[in-house]
Amino acid sequence: MFDVLVIGSGHAGCEAAVAAARRGAKVGLISFRPNDAGQMSCNPSIGGVGKGHLVRELDVFDGLMARAADRAAIHRRMLNRSKGPAVWGPRVQADRQLFRSAIELLLQSLPIERIVGEVTSLRLNGNEVVAVVLGDGTIIKARSVVVATGTFLDARTYLGLECRSAGRAGERSAIPLAAQMREVGLAARRLKTGTPPRLDGRTIDWARLEEQPSDDEAWRFSAHPEHLPSVPQLRCAITRTTIATHDLIRKSEDQSPLYAGLIEGRGPRYCPSIEDKVRRFGDRDGHQIFLEPE
């Protein structure tokens, strides 16, 4: 019997498991694969305007994300420096493997039992969750269950107009659990995010781009006075779209799931996809494109 059982070992799941374990609870952490803890999805960055301060607030409560980001940072940038400190946006580009390793190290410092499997249903006693059931039929009892499945609940991915059931590129979606949660009347809404394309750096003429080096000041997200490993800092770069780019995007709008009527989820308010930028701000002669190390 666990005091706290956490489903999902992404950012939220790991934070929940650690917070419970530090309070003396017997904690189980369930994930699809043994090496999933701290796995970064989409764009491997932490922070930014409207987000970096949240990472630091997590750190105030002894969270993991800030410390892992500091250990994995390969590019640091304090955004909005031209404005007052209250709206500065600390942001790092992280090395995926270093970030995952940092989270794993922090998890291993606490008595958290790791469980590999897919939770296919919740066992209910009235309105109370008393256990979870894995895909192989294993029943795990718990006094409380934290659902931290992130993007995996009945998730879909689109590659052009091709739709696949996936929680992350190449990984399956948690369909049975999502179906049960709908059956018991839990409200659900889809969110939409776009994954930036990956480019082979050897095919890019870097000399024609505007370099964006890492900040000279090696600031940290975390206030913990711990020694950090020396991680080489890499450069990002900036370029811009052109009128020709916009014309090509407009001609290909019917190949975008966003405008083909396939996307149901609500996209991020301040980070529209490039085709959305061209449609909404078509009067501009160019939009910034950031090239970041992966």
Positions of the model-derived regions?
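Beta1/beta-strand and adjacent pyrophosphate-binding region of the FAD-binding site
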Residues: 1-12
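Redox-cofactor binding/interface segments in oxidoreductases and associated redox assembly factors
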Residues: 7, 134, 147-148
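Conserved N-terminal/central alpha/beta ligand/cofactor-binding core
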Residues: 18-124, 144, 148-168, 172-177, ...
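Short alpha-helical segments and helix-capping/turn motifs at coil-helix boundaries
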Residues: 11-15, 100-102, 129-134, 176, ...
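C-terminal catalytic lobe of FAD-dependent flavoproteins
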Residues: 253-294
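Conserved beta-strand-loop-beta-strand element in the redox core of flavoprotein oxidoreductases
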Residues: 123-139
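Glycine-rich nucleotide phosphate-binding loop and flanking beta-alpha elements
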Residues: 13, 140, 152-154
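Core beta-strand elements of the Rossmann-like FAD/NAD(P) dinucleotide-binding domain
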Residues: 2, 135-144
